[in-house]
Amino acid sequence: MDNGTLPVQGSLDRMAALAQYLHDTDLAYYDKIYVSLDWHPINHCSFAEQGGPWPSHCVGYTTDALVTDSVLDELKRWMQAGKVEFIRKGEHVDFDEYSALDNEAVAAHLAYELRQADRLDVCGVVGTVCVQNTLKGLIEKAIDADKITVLTAYTAQFDADAEKEFVKWCADNVIALA
């Protein structure tokens, strides 16, 4: 988030907008909402202290690893309807999982469920890292790109250059932006 250990400019505003979207959206619109969470051990291999590329971030059980309060408040209505599933990624100390589909414990089941969907709306933080890798994972798991839409108003990037890179990647892979 903006003020986290791996700050992403504008992410709090994007998550506030996502919370409003969830508030305004009828429960019947989505069959299921999957929320992936970076959930790293304190000595994760991706951290600079361990020789990785990133500062320490999203350490499990810290506020860095959680969804924002505003999004969680709006998810509660969906959770009461049995429509939310949380997926942790990056829990293993020795390798990273940038995609929600990299978590081998849930990947096959998740891919199966997502293949059954008529449409998939995807959003999150950080677009060029976790969101883009999740999109790649969807395509690798034989999920049709034509039913995927990235909700850009709720997708935060590191900076304007990353935003351009992400938009180009989506266009190159025939993934719709809304």
Regions found by a protein language model. Give the residues of each.
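Short catalytic/ligand-binding loop motif for oxyanion handling, primarily in non-cytosolic enzymes
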Residues: 41-45, 94-96, 129-131
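Short Gly/Thr/Asp-enriched flexible loops that form oxyanion-binding sites at enzyme active sites
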Residues: 131-141
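Glycine-rich phosphate- or other oxyanion-binding loops that anchor nucleotides, phosphorylated ligands
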Residues: 84-115, 119
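Histidine- and/or cysteine-centered catalytic micro-motif in compact active-site loops
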Residues: 38-39, 89-92, 125
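Short, small-residue-enriched loops and turns at beta-alpha junctions
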Residues: 94-95, 155-159
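Active-site acidic carboxylates
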Residues: 1-87, 112, 116, 142-150, ...
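Glycine-rich anion-binding loop/nest that anchors nucleotide
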Residues: 118-133, 149-156
